[in-house]
Amino acid sequence: MEKRIFVISDLHGQFVLLQLLLDRIGFNDNDELYILGDIMDRGPNSIDIYYFVQAMDNIHMIKGNHEIMMRQSMQTALKYNDLDSERSNPYRLWKQNGAQKTVNSIREYLQKDCIPYEEYFDLKQMFIKEVIAFIDSLPSYIELDLNDKHYVLVHAGVDPEIP
């Protein structure tokens, strides 16, 4: 079976729709999917997409502005020990762009209301560090050669000042 290349962007927490799309196109192990950022926020299933992308060897991702906002907010969350600290300018910007559903899904995933606070605190700190490491591992662009053509895949544009 021939390898197919698919490119998508701005999933914004819509894991169910992503699954439906992949089923509809018959996405398989021979195919490759490039996600051009913004898997988080606005939709109900950001955590599901986050883990799905990491589990799949044939899915490649670059960071978008929502991942950048999330990373900045998570870095501040380590300082204030709060995912949605209103003291955080990065969080306020992230919140204006749909962060609350992501924060809610993180709290649900970490079972905030089901475990003792001390355990939740430790689990949250580990999770935040994991998210920061994941976002830091994402490139800002991907170069792809396909059918004798060279492509540069980006989220929203190229800044010549950023390597």
Residue positions per predicted region:
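Feature recognizes metal-dependent phosphohydrolase scaffolds
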Residues: 1-163
